Amino acid sequence: MKTYAWILLTIFIFGCNQNTQSQNNKKHYVDLKTVADLQDYLAYKKGQKAIVSAHRGGPMPGYPENAIETFENALTYAPCIIELDVNKTADGKLILMHDDTLDRTTTGSGKVSEATWEQLQKLHLKDAEGTVTSFKIPTFEEVLNWGKTRAVMCIDIKKGIDPQEIVDMIHKTQAQKHSIIIVYNRPMLVKYHKIDPSLCISASASTVESVKETLALGVPSKNLIMFVGISEPQPEVYELLHQNGIKAILGTMHNLDNSALKKGEQVYQKLISNGADVLATDNVKLSASAISKMK
């Protein structure tokens, strides 16, 4: 009888441990079915919870930037928008890489544009401290397919890459429903919209005047989310965006993230109370925790 009781206790403890582990490893996936779903997800709605945007995918110790494994880790903290960087190899392969050179984030060296995809496949990614990981450089196509049932992706395209190439890959992978294109000027905004009027685009505007000028280009508000800079804009900027149903992304990387590290989660909570809808952050864990505690 004692033996039987011990077996039951062991099974119970094992089951509890497994349950705790699965809770700790829970993934906050966002599975959108249509472009209309993405437009609705990005639309400003009063009282809606703020969203974390994981800058460069949310790197942490052991998790290098622009790696699928890092994206998966970020999603254990919150249903993050995954911000990523697209670069291009010497032989025309679209890959994920922020820098123009390989030295900082990989075991390789030299320019990305001078390396072939075959050469890059032999490299490993390094985290921010320079620790070599087992993770490999992913292709843009691989990441678009990965994100289909997992996350909205905000795509930062390096200079020199033809917008048509980016859109063609999005179409090939049927990724319109979970892809946002980042642009840094109005001509590029218009260009992407002309290539595919259904695309959702992250434009930049940090003043009331620049918001008005962007809206005057004719891109529907439902296709837009607006990056307002790495410091807080005037309240009128948030008001104008929200009046047009557009969410505002505030970049907290650098100064605002550093302030939150020193002063605590209330820094993020204050930014959200002031009008920010999305926090583009290098500190996924802290910002996600701050948002989770807000009503």
Language-model-detected regions and their locations in the chain:
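Phosphate-group recognition and catalysis centered on beta-loop-alpha active-site segments
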Residues: C16-K295
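Sec-dependent N-terminal signal peptides
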Residues: Y4-I13
